[in-house]
């Protein structure tokens, strides 16, 4: 059994990326895995100040917000699912803030290592256009020693709920079941 952390970064509740994450979770739970879902829209996570205090004081950020509860979850997970709607060919602001604020556990080979990652992106454009966003996510994984990307889902949809009935839903379920 793996411990899975599913990060939903969309600011829109019930949006397409969250629907895909829910399918991934369904498959993973049916396979017997322990899954926790974290919705960043429900968290107060300020942007990184780049003060590097966390690198000097054992990994504690000077900002007192919800990132303090997200960091341990990232470290404890065996598998991390990162989902984002594509905004201007990149990740949404909520996910970018979380990524930047994970410096205390990822810097210089820090405390986070050997994770399996799955990426879920959604956009109205075709999968080729989402590749830039996937590259952004890959950059994060490249900073975490021993970590690998095990799967990617390109959800082509725009309006909330439009992803229902599309092949990406089945792909998300199957990736969750096989992880």
Model-derived regions: residue spans:
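Cofactor-binding loop segments of dinucleotide-utilizing enzymes, especially the Rossmann-like FAD-
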Residues: 9, 40, 122-124, 155
């Amino acid at each position: 059994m793996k411990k899975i952390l599913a990060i939903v970064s969309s600011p829109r509740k019930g949006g397409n990326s969250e629907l895909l994450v829910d399918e991934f979770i369904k498959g993973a739970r049916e396979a017997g895995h322990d899954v926790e879902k974290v919705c960043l829209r429900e968290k107060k996570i300020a942007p990184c100040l780049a003060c590097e205090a966390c690198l000097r004081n054992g990994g504690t950020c000077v900002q007192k917000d919800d990132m303090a509860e997200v960091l341990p979850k990232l470290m404890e997970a065996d598998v991390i699912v990162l989902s984002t709607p594509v905004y201007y060919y990149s990740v949404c602001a909520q996910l970018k803030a979380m990524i930047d604020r994970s410096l205390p556990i990822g810097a210089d080979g820090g405390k986070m290592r050997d994770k399996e990652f799955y990426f879920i992106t959604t956009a109205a454009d075709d999968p080729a256009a989402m590749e830039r966003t996937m590259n952004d996510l890959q950059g994060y994984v490249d900073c975490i020693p021993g970590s690998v990307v095990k799967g990617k889902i390109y959800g082509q949809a725009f309006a909330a709920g439009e992803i229902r009935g599309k092949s990406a839903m089945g792909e998300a379920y199957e990736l969750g079941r096989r992880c």
